[in-house]
């Protein structure tokens, strides 16, 4: 998921607009086959054939390991990921899930109560983060009157590990570095390196002029994939929503 603050599904009006555009493309052909239809849909521009957003922040780094999973943030996308694991793996237990939290604002953790593998005995959930009281924040989210099932009632083994942005770590074969980011309450970006490939996860971060060209450039340098907060237009990030803790595609 990539949606900020709240999950948002595609609306019926948006679906209708996409279908109308497909019909418009079809009308340009004198005759049409099923193969033509599939080709039109697959080659149509992104806004017509696909969608983005929907769930809040949750990203899997998939290196093919079906026993140890690397997950970045626990937004509502974690529910879909858990359902995928339950549907597509023959063995549902004895799996380890490493979940790295950028910060504990609600949209980055509120998928965890709906993560099915966390309810299965034999699974192990390790949650990493730099913020103090990481475990307490997860417990509070699942306390009465907010949620009926407490964190302790989830049957998988759960472990919380506090990291430091001053240290480097080796976890599940990844060399991991962390950087502090400008966001209300602070957020943290992560760099993952394995087999000569580098992924940077940097969400919920505002980059002002004074940090451009500083440690962030080195942190991002040589990334094979960079996941970057580009929520705002340049005008929003510089004026209307300055100091809200987010960035723009222009700065990316």
Where are the model-predicted features located?
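Binuclear metal-dependent hydrolase catalytic cores
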Residues: 1-200, 210-211
């Amino acid at each position: 998921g990539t949606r900020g603050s709240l999950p948002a599904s595609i609306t019926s009006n948006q679906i209708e607009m996409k279908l109308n555009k497909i019909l418009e493309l079809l009308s340009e052909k004198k005759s049409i086959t099923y193969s033509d239809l599939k080709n039109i849909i697959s080659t149509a521009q992104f806004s017509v054939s696909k969608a983005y957003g929907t769930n809040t922040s949750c990203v899997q780094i998939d290196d093919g390991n079906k026993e140890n999973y690397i997950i970045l943030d626990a937004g509502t996308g974690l529910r879909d990921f858990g359902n995928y694991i339950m549907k597509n793996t023959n063995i549902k237990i004895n799996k380890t899930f490493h979940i790295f939290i950028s910060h504990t604002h609600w949209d980055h953790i509120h998928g965890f109560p709906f993560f099915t593998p966390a309810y299965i005995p034999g699974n192990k959930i390790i949650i990493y983060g730099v913020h103090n009281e990481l475990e307490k924040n997860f417990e509070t989210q699942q306390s009465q009157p907010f949620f009926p099932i407490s964190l302790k009632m989830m049957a998988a083994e759960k472990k919380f590990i506090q990291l430091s942005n001053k240290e480097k770590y080796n976890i599940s074969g990844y060399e991991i570095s962390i950087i502090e980011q400008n966001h209300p309450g602070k957020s943290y970006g992560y760099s993952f390196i394995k087999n000569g490939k580098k992924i940077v996860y940097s969400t919920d971060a505002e980059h002002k002029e004074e940090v451009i060209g500083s440690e962030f450039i080195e942190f991002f340098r040589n990334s094979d994939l960079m996941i970057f907060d580009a929520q705002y237009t340049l005008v929003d990030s510089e004026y209307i929503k300055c100091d809200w803790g987010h960035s723009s595609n222009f700065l990316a």
